[in-house]
């Protein structure tokens, strides 16, 4: 997972083993500033079935025990453990592989083809590059993973249906649908 600071790296190093023990993966670590900083950790199940509230609560309790000893954030802060949501951030190459065929927004740390923001359909991963099929373009655009600072799935009906199906809650059929 890509992080934005050495502090995020330290938090991630503490959180990942705890997540692994619970069959979870850390999707993103962020510290939100304010009067009282908020440490936000997004997690998901490693089996792809989606994290539940109970999983978040267990992970939060386990992290609190570790963070109480290691103290990765100076001063008082609030710990928030949450699901990445349906329109989740993509932070690792395996995320881009897993969500191939879905629409995504990507922001880069530098210009590519004269811009930093892209939107299109994920077209796979090859040699550390993320493939993106964009409207009006004949060729797949290959973006170096290392240039990506933010990437997020776009909420679509197909994405919602895929999420429901993965959780075993596929769309209900009505009498005329059969």
UniProtKB/Swiss-Prot annotation:
GO biological process: ribosomal small subunit assembly; translation
Signal peptide bounds: none
rRNA-binding is among the record's keywords: no
GO cellular component: cytosol
Record's keyword annotation contains Transferase: no
Matches recorded under CDD domains: YlxS_C
Cellular localisation: Cytoplasm
InterPro entries referenced in this protein's UniProt entry, alphabetically: Ribosome_maturation_RimP, RimP_C, RimP_C_sf, RimP_N, RimP_N_sf
Superkingdom of the source species: Bacteria
Keywords assigned by UniProt, alphabetized: Cytoplasm, Ribosome biogenesis
Family the UniProt entry places it in: Belongs to the RimP family.
Purpose of the protein: Required for maturation of 30S ribosomal subunits.
Protein name as catalogued: Ribosome maturation factor RimP
Gene: rimP
């Amino acid at each position: 997972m890509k992080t934005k600071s050495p502090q995020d790296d330290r938090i991630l190093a503490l959180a990942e083993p705890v997540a692994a023990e619970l069959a979870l993966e850390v999707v993103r670590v962020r510290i939100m500033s304010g009067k009282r900083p908020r440490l936000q950790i997004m997690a998901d199940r490693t089996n792809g079935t989606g994290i539940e509230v109970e999983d978040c609560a267990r992970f939060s309790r386990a992290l609190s025990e570790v963070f109480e000893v290691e103290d990765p954030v100076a001063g008082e802060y609030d710990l928030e453990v949450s699901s990445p949501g349906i329109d989740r951030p993509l932070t690792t190459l395996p995320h881009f592989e897993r969500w191939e065929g879905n629409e995504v927004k990507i922001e880069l740390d530098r210009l590519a083809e004269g811009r930093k923001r892209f939107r299109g359909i994920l077209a796979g991963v090859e040699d550390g590059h993320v493939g993106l099929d964009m409207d009006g373009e004949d060729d797949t655009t290959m973006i170096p993973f290392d240039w990506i600072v933010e990437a997020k799935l776009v909420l679509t009906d197909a994405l919602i249906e895929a999420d429901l199906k993965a959780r075993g809650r596929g769309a209900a059929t009505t009498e005329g649908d059969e």
